[in-house]
Structure formats: structure tokens, C-alpha cells
A protein has these predicted regions:
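Membrane-anchoring hydrophobic helices of lipid-metabolizing enzymes
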Residues: 1-84, 95, 108-116, 195, ...
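Non-catalytic C-terminal accessory region of glycerolipid acyltransferases
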Residues: 2-24, 128-275
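Glycine-rich, highly charged phosphate/nucleotide-binding loops
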Residues: 48-53, 123-134
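Short helix-capping segments at alpha-helix termini
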Residues: 89-92
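Short internal beta-strands
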Residues: 96-102
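Hydrophobic/aromatic beta-strand patches that form the interior of the parallel beta-sheet core
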Residues: 99, 117, 180-182
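Short, polar loop motifs at secondary-structure junctions
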Residues: 102-106, 185
Length: 275
């Protein structure tokens, strides 16, 4: 069995010399997802919340029989970890793949075990190889999901949205795919830890289908989704959101919280009395 897996990996490396294929492990991937979702993210963030009006959209992804492409804005190192938590929570039956800079992937080889493959973003031949690689995954995986960050690099949430052409080329290449935009923001509200705030919406394809048309559709869809989420983030109100990770009562720090409990006072921070 081990020899078979090794041979398969070698065959793929020879078939796709311009990229680093993923080496998905059905044993390692679920454990990694559990650790990220149940340990790593809750330790670093107060809560992960999704806009309630987009909850059914997120859940519907799990039942789509065709391949799905997910496009996310790219602010931070945490983006793929949040994407993994979304997948584990809302579309757990799908098998995901996602590209990453091959140079960075060399530093974190375990990520290949969860479906990450390496590309050379500035090499046109590597980008062309990615299309062929994705096509091979779409043809062999059951209900595959491709997660992309089309900006291609970290970008401030306030900066104008500029997308590289790869995502549009892939969407045009696979017209049967369903495409969704995932907007993410990291914000400090009342707790000492930040919130992760998410909104999901479908992206309608262009008519006729073309790379240029998809580039325009993705740009407009991601801008609209991001703007709607931003308005809710600035309102600093958790009411329009559904919390799916964390979300315990806000506090300042363990010592202050203990002191307040000893005095019989609530440790929760709130500004509702001012409304």
C-alpha cells in the first residue's frame, strides 16, 4: 500500500513538473481540520461568525454535485485556516484542493496532506499547469471544491480589489462549476481577542462565458460581498450573525474576570445600555 501511494505521488510529480501536487491523506486531513477548528482558532479568536442571511447559501454548497470554486479575499495568514473551518462546518462531505506558493509550501509540507498544492505564481507555465492539474482533480474527485484567493497576495481590506487572472481563467475553463464569494474580516469588538466575520454569496457567471467576463463577474461579486460585510462589521452588532465557533461572554482578562466573579458581578463587556 505504501509503495502504491509513493508510486502515485511520483507519477503525479512527473506529470505536473511545473507545480507540487497535493498528497491528500484521509488519515491526516480530518485530524488537522479538527485541530484547526476546535483548538487553534478558538485559542486565537473570540468568535467566528457568519452573516445569518448567508447561512443557507453556505450550507447548500455541501449538496452541490458539480465542482465548486470558492473565491476569498486575502488579508492574512489565517485565511486558509478559516476556509478549513468553514469546510469542516458547512460542506464536510466535499473534498477540497487549494493552491499555495510552492516556495512557502516547502516550509509547511504537512499542508499537502490536506489538499494544498504548490504553484509558482509568477511563472506562466506553472499557471497553465495549474489548469491541467485542477482538471485532473475535478475529473477524479467526488464533488470537489477549489478554494482560491484571487488577489494572489495579502491585501488590506481597505485597498482596491485587484484580482490576478487565474481564477477567471479557471471559472471559464470549467463552465459547469458553481462559484461562490467568501468575504472575511478580522475585527476587534468588545473582547480582548478579535472576531472573524464572514459572508457567503453566489457569483453569477457571465454571458457569454469568457475569461474577461468572469474576471469582471468575480471582481464585482467580491466587491459587493465585501461591502455588505463591511457595513455589518462597522455596525459592531452581532445580531445579524450566527456564531459557529467560540462566542463566550466577552471579558477583559482572566484576573479581572476572576475579581468580578468574586464580587458577584458579570464579566461580560457590553455597550447595550447606551443604545
Amino acid at each position: 500500500m505504501a509503495a502504491s501511494i509513493t508510486n502515485t505521488a511520483s507519477d503525479e510529480a512527473a506529470k505536473f513538473p511545473r507545480l507540487v501536487p497535493d498528497a491528500y491523506s484521509p488519515q491526516i486531513a480530518p485530524v488537522f481540520a479538527w485541530y484547526v477548528t476546535r483548538r487553534l482558532i478558538p485559542a486565537r479568536f473570540h468568535a467566528v461568525r457568519i452573516v445569518t442571511e448567508s447561512l443557507e447559501v453556505a450550507r447548500s454548497i455541501d449538496s452541490i454535485s458539480d465542482p465548486v470554486i470558492l473565491v476569498m479575499n486575502h488579508q492574512a495568514w489565517w485565511d486558509p485556516m478559516i476556509g478549513l473551518a468553514l469546510a469542516a462546518t458547512f460542506w464536510p462531505s466535499r473534498r477540497g484542493v487549494a493552491p499555495m506558493d510552492a516556495t512557502q509550501l516547502e516550509k509547511f509540507p504537512i499542508l499537502r496532506k490536506i489538499g494544498i498544492f504548490g504553484i509558482h505564481p509568477d511563472d506562466p507555465k506553472s499557471m497553465a499547469a495549474m489548469v491541467d492539474f485542477v482538471q485532473s482533480r475535478f475529473a477524479t474527485l467526488p464533488r470537489p471544491t477549489l478554494m482560491l484567493t484571487p488577489q494572489g497576495e495579502f491585501a488590506d481590506i481597505r485597498a482596491p480589489l485587484v484580482l490576478r487572472p487565474g481564477a477567471a481563467a479557471l471559472a471559464a475553463k470549467f463552465p459547469a462549476c458553481r462559484v461562490f464569494s467568501i468575504a472575511i474580516e478580522y475585527a476587534f469588538w468588545l473582547d480582548q481577542k478579535p472576531e472573524v466575520l464572514i459572508r457567503v454569496q453566489p457569483v453569477a457567471g457571465p454571458e457569454p462565458i469568457s475569461t474577461t467576463g468572469w474576471h469582471r463577474a468575480l471582481t464585482m461579486g467580491m466587491q459587493e460581498n465585501g461591502a455588505r460585510l463591511a457595513a455589518m462589521v462597522m455596525a459592531r452588532d452581532q445580531a445579524p450573525f450566527t456564531t459557529f465557533l467560540g462566542g463566550a461572554a466577552s471579558g477583559t482578562n482572566p484576573f479581572y474576570n476572576l475579581w468580578n466573579r468574586l464580587r458577584g458581578k458579570s464579566t461580560e463587556l457590553s455597550t447595550s445600555h447606551r443604545r
